[in-house]
Amino acid sequence: MKRVVAALIWREGKILICQRTRHQPMPLKWEFPGGKIEEGEQPRDALRRELDEELGIAAEIGDEVARIRHEYPSGNSVELRFFDVRSYAGEVENRIFREILWAIPADLPKYDFLEADLTLVRDLAGGKFA
């Protein structure tokens, strides 16, 4: 099972979402920023590293707000751990994605998210975690 961390990064009531490029697995799907936990790495450390690599920010990682296990039809499975991020240093910059944007949580279902993120997308759209 692949272990992944992702951030719910908030700014003025909006949440940061990212669109994969055409060349990534599951191309053009939307997701929350983050990535794989490397061998021997703690989840919060992995998320700090990923946010620095992908967005150029030094994030203050808050509480774990959700943990989701998902199995794709291909048989691949993933455990996603989502953490709240309300504070960070630096300006958010798009280093690897096709597009990034700040979305109103109620609008999240309009975007074509990764299947593993859909439960959380519905919760966020319903006002959870705001």
Question: Where are these predicted regions, by residue range?
Answer:
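Conserved Nudix-box catalytic region and its N-terminal flanking loop in Nudix hydrolases
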Residues: 14-53
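Conserved hydrophobic "DFG−1" position in protein kinase catalytic cores
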Residues: 9-10, 17, 87, 102
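NUDIX/MutT-family hydrolases
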Residues: 82-84, 93-124
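Active-site-adjacent beta-strand/loop module that shapes the phosphate/pyrophosphate-binding cleft
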Residues: 58-59, 66-92, 99-102
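Generic C-terminal helix-cap and adjacent flexible tail
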Residues: 125-130
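Residue-level signal for inorganic ion chemistry
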Residues: 7, 32, 104
